[in-house]
């Protein structure tokens, strides 16, 4: 049986809520954020809101770090919560023009602009001469840069969230 530890942080207060059975954790490799669904029991102490950090460990291993995006309270004392990792912010649309950047540098640029945390971002090496991305999701901007890298180097890279840090690996 797995030992699951889930906590929610609201400011400086950390809660270890009573979680009902049925936590679901979804990971997809391309173009989608990690998603955590769970139901907590509302008591007189638990106080959290959208945007608060959520962390989950399984058997002592860090597996999910994200943020509450929605919560729905039923007629009783149960609150259904959906949290996403920071790749959720890659669904934002924006316009970018860049010159002579690697896919790694594009990811670091987007992370800096959106205040996202990065971990290991491997150097993809291939410099993209010039690109204009008009009203594209950040996922599409990154995927285009990675596709151009694969076409020119035959090396494939994967972007994922490693417990709260954007990570790019070959």
Name each region found by the language model:
Residues 78-79, 85-86, 120-170:
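Short beta-strand-centered interaction patches in the first periplasmic/extracellular domains
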Residues 47, 99-104, 134-142:
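Solvent-exposed, acidic/flexible segments
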Residues 92-100, 129-132:
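Second-shell loop/turn segments in exported
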Residues 71, 102-119:
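Glycine-rich, acidic and aromatic/proline-enriched surface loops and short helix-turn segments
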Residues 52-56, 96-101:
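Short intrinsically disordered coil segments
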Residues 57-58, 111, 118, 159:
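Alpha-helix C-terminal capping segments
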Residues 1-89:
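Assembly/oligomerization scaffold segments
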């Amino acid at each position: 049986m797995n030992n699951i530890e889930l906590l929610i942080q609201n400011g400086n207060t950390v809660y270890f809520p009573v979680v009902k059975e049925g936590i679901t954790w979804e990971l997809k490799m391309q173009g989608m954020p990690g998603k955590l669904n769970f139901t907590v029991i509302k008591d007189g102490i638990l106080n959290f809101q959208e945007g608060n950090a959520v962390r989950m460990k399984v058997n002592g291993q860090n597996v999910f770090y994200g943020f509450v995006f929605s919560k729905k309270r039923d007629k009783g004392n149960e609150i259904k919560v959906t949290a996403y990792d920071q790749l959720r912010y890659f669904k934002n649309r924006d316009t970018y023009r860049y010159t002579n950047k690697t896919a790694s540098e594009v990811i670091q640029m987007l992370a800096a602009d959106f205040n996202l945390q990065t971990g290991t971002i491997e150097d993809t090496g291939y410099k993209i001469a010039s690109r204009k991305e008009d009203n594209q999701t950040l996922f599409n901007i990154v995927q285009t840069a990675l596709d151009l890298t694969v076409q020119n180097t035959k090396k494939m890279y994967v972007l994922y969230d490693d417990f709260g840090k954007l990570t790019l690996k070959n």
